[in-house]
Amino acid sequence: MQKNYFINVTDYKVLLTISYLNELGYIASAQGVLKILSGVIDEETEMFELCPTFQVLVSYNSKKMTRDLNRLVTYGYLKRIHNEELKDYFFEITEKGKVTLSYFGSHHKVNLKKHDINPRVTIIKKGK
């Protein structure tokens, strides 16, 4: 018998991102989800700047994202779809994921504040 896994806020943000993409008719790989959550703007992600989770996890890395996505697939919140042409896995939210998403969103306060990436000055010219 499979144990239940209770999602955390980061899992909620990942599920919300994938749900948003699925509603628009898109599916994303782990790299695509990471690009949206960390706020990378390029030709693939510029149309998703209005996504509620765009740029909310700026310090997340690829290893953590893959781990979280695999865990969500294991517990049935996401479905993994293999694309033979691109030789990559893409993710789609399941019915269980949709129910959990609506329940978690209505019972928990989640901050979807966008984080600005302002690089700090690390080298300055020495004054006279």
Predicted feature residues:
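Accessory DNA-binding and partner-docking regions appended to nucleic-acid-acting proteins
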Residues: M1-K128
